[in-house]
Curated annotation (Swiss-Prot):
It comes from Brucella suis biovar 1 (strain 1330). The gene is minC. PANTHER family: SEPTUM SITE-DETERMINING PROTEIN MINC (PTHR34108:SF1). The lineage of its organism: Bacteria, Pseudomonadati, Pseudomonadota, Alphaproteobacteria, Hyphomicrobiales. InterPro entries: CAP/MinC_C (IPR016098), MinC (IPR013033), MinC_C_sf (IPR036145), Septum_form_inhib_MinC_C (IPR005526). This is Probable septum site-determining protein MinC. Belongs to the MinC family. Keywords: Cell cycle, Cell division, Septation.
């Protein structure tokens, strides 16, 4: 019997860029967690299966408070894949790893356009961590989906506009760096302008959305005026306010 000697194959290490949410907690933590609970209640499944990075850069807390926060998020089904901006003494065994070099794009922050129960309370801030372009892009690329987006499916295209020739089902999600055009019913979530594009818009033939967001400003189904539901509409930003109007 002949013995065949083979060379050990080297381990191949590759670099890839992935899309993740970034949560920026604020003090007091219990108050911020209540706001997070409200967001999760108004948009069911928003954090389900999402990798999330915790932004600690502007949060002055001690390790015990961080442990409490991580446990509270875990209890809510929010999976923290890493911590950014935390001083080394805060992190320890059993905690998510420290992350560096994140390039946040647009913040998902509730607009101040409509009165809230407590208008002085800060809203939880969420952002999309994406690869930022190195130079200004004048002609944004686009993606066209020629079939409906079904429940549980997600369409991510941070480079430009997304057009859906069909409907977006409840529990589905469309995320675009530019505008979103839906030639059907929007029942799920549509997040436009995630690359910091304040001129992005959302268009749909029939509005039944769970959540809409443009450049960080979001509205849930409860925030949308009833007279716009079931209508063909467009949404856009005017400063820090999200505007909505019917399509003629």
């Amino acid at each position: 019997m002949n013995q065949v000697l083979t060379e050990t194959r080297p381990i191949r290490l590759k670099g890839r860029s992935f899309l993740a949410m970034v949560l920026s907690p604020e003090l007091p933590l219990d108050g911020w967690l209540e706001l997070l609970d409200d967001l999760a209640r108004r948009s069911s499944g928003f954090f389900l299966g999402r990798p999330v990075v915790l932004d600690m850069e502007n949060l002055a807390i001690e390790r015990a408070q961080l442990v409490y926060l991580l446990q509270a998020l875990n209890d809510r089904g929010v999976w923290i894949m890493g911590v950014e901006g935390a001083r080394p003494s805060l992190l320890g065994p059993g905690m998510p790893p420290a992350m560096r070099g994140g390039q946040p794009a647009a913040d998902f922050e509730a607009p101040a356009g409509e009165p809230q129960a407590n208008p002085g309370a800060p809203e939880p801030q969420i952002s999309q961590a994406v690869r930022a372009p190195g130079h200004a892009v004048h002609a944004m690329p686009s993606m066209v989906i020629t079939e409906p987006v079904r429940s549980g499916q997600s369409v991510y295209f941070p480079e430009g506009d997304v057009t859906i020739v069909g409907s977006v089902a409840s529990g589905a999600e469309v995320v675009a760096g530019g505008s979103i055009h839906i030639y059907g019913t929007l029942r799920g979530r549509a997040l436009a302008g995630t690359a910091g594009n304040t001129s992005a818009r959302i268009f749909c033939r029939k509005l039944e959305a769970e959540l809409v967001a443009i450049d960080g400003l979001y509205k849930t189904a409860e925030d949308l005026e009833p007279r716009f539901r079931g209508q063909a509409v467009q949404l856009w930003l005017d400063g820090d306010y999200m505007m909505i109007d019917t399509l003629s």
